[in-house]
Curated annotation (Swiss-Prot):
Residues annotated as domain ABC transmembrane type-1: 130-419
Positions in the Mitochondrial matrix compartment: 39-129, 198-246, 293-358, 415-710
One Gene Ontology molecular-function label: ATP binding
Similarity section: Belongs to the ABC transporter superfamily. ABCB family. Heavy Metal importer (TC 3.A.1.210) subfamily.
Binding, glutathione: 298-302, 361-364, 411
Annotated organelle transit peptide span: 1-38
Positions of the UniProt region annotated as Disordered: 35-83
Side Mitochondrial intermembrane, residues: 152-173, 271, 378-392
Protein name, entry field: Iron-sulfur clusters transporter ATM1, mitochondrial
Binding of ATP, residues: 462, 486-497
Organism: Yarrowia lipolytica (strain CLIB 122 / E 150) (Yeast)
Record flagged with keyword Nucleotide-binding: yes
Transferase recorded as keyword: no
Membrane topology (UniProt): Multi-pass membrane protein
Amino acid sequence: MWLSLPRSGYGSVATLTSKRVLACLTPLRQFSTSPAVSNANHKNVDNINKSPANDAANNAVEKGDKPTTSPEKLATKAEKSSANSVKAAANALGESNLSNSEQRRLDWIIMKDMLKYIWPKGKTSVKFRVLVAVALLVGAKLLNVQVPFFFKEIIDDMNIEWNSATALGVGITALIFSYGAARFGAVLFGELRNAIFASVAQKAIKEVATNVFRHLLKLDMAFHLSRQTGGITRAIDRGTKGISFVLSSMVFHIIPIALEISLVCGILSYNFGWKYALVTGATMVSYAIFTITTTSWRTKFRRNANRADNEASNVCLDSLINIEAVKSFGNEGYMVDKYQSALTKYEKASIKIATSLAFLNSGQNLIFSSALTAMMYMTCCGVADGSLTVGDLVLVNQLVFQLSVPLNFLGSVYRDLRQSLLDMGSLFSLQKVAGQIQESPNAKPLQLTNGEIRFENVTYGYHPDRPILKNASFVIPGGLKTAIVGPSGSGKSTILKLAFRFYDTQEGRILIDGQDVREVTLASLRSAIGVVPQDTPLFNDSIMNNIRFGRLEADDKEVENAACAAKLDALVRQLPDGWNTNVGERGMMISGGEKQRLAVARVLLKNSPVVFLDEATSALDTNTERQLLANMDQVLGDKTCVAIAHRLRTVADSDKIICLNQGGVEEEGTQAELLLKDGLYKSMWDAQEQVELGEEGIKEAEEKAAKKDV
């Protein structure tokens, strides 16, 4: 089929996220960011691992009128909309460099948006879980603070002369058991908190991921053809992993850390004086400033790693999706080198992440160790002059180390939180990508009578400076078979995409039974049209399920009948697994002709009143093609059928033939009428006849030679 735009299939995006492809991406996956893993590794682990162009036209168009908005203004609006979408998509894939202030602004927006998952409206069970988790958290912190006091009392009570006759008193024994119970209770409350809150985080992950996936499927073809799917899947993968950490951080880290630091500082100040409060306060301020400043500096390394990760994923995905081409041209080595080059970029960025992490950890440890040394010195002086006891020394030591836990969390949580927010920013940016194809607020379901399709002064081009259709006007009569033919680049397949509203016209309008396609709902429009594309999009699933994709509610018998009409039943009977035979990635385990018959079966099962056939039999042999076309003519009956064809013999029986050339209608009529005109169609027909007659002569000679040999 002649095309002016590289084809990717009418549903190929959905096939790109197969398990086989995603499996190759797992070596680059991040470490888990669940609360349990974060707590275990908080010190040393870093997560290295409504189209504006058409609104004016729609408002201006009345029945029989042309848009009053000039093509130049329409193009300008379309470019602005496209530019905004591209910018949002670039943010989503880590391809744009945000300043620190812009990144912080985005972080706050994300955290504000995540609050609705912690405290959702109308979901009492979720709110109850959050309240219980918070109560367990407070209980754990209070028990944690009690542990050093029990230890101090034990030390002071034990600071006596002991001999073999001395026994532990009831008080000391009770303190020892209280010490153990407090430690165990703090840990138990923490684990119960994690278990109870887990469902809240997982529900949020499911809801966000589903919303993003739904939005991606609603975006127009222009977006999907301009983006690399590998980068999108990685953005979703990283973003969903960050949701759990951000939610748990908001509930279990930020507020609790502030609470614990306040408790420890208050105790030190109350029990030991203002000097301890001064050291503690200076430590807090120094630690926070150093951590925030250093982490902000490190963010660019993480962004570079994400960009390299996306690049590697894209190379891997493209290689596996096009594995046949890779092997056919023997370019395995080239693709490996390309993949390794992307991994090298990821390696360099990851090394910078690791080395900057070492600097961060060292600086944090220096600040904390200095504070610990100062406090221990002051306490030892107090013990020496008798104002403090040995138990007080132990208490200060324990409280300072108690302070180290929230301090370390402050550093690691802020660091990991920034990384998670950076990853989530990509995920949420995908939701802000505005599709160029928008449904009108007043859209109504398409009402079909006879299925007439009318193009009125339609101008469209995939690029503004290269229009494919130029002020084209023609009518596809309802209930009849119409063929669209023409040389390469004349806009044949573009007509299908515009009728289906994969794209919107830049000028003019398209009417189906008198209804502008931009004024009807997308669901009703696309359910009314069935398509057999030249490049058949198949899923890595069974033959039965691939055909049933045309109408999901169809039963097995209906699927089998559609396959029989498409001459596919004979193939199925020969297969060991029959209808359950898997067709492989993009249908690579069956032949091109078999794929086309499967696509025909799918559209026959859909049973839509309008059918487009885009070179639907180009991969079939002559006999199978004739049988299939005869079957389809019988099955389609009085449906509106539009056949886009290169081989003119396959559409010679059409009720009407529209011949396109240079973006407009060159001529139209029946086969006989066009041959009498002696125009473009006649010249194309004669050229093909000469080729086919030559091929038939060669075939006859080969058959005669074979009989002679026998």
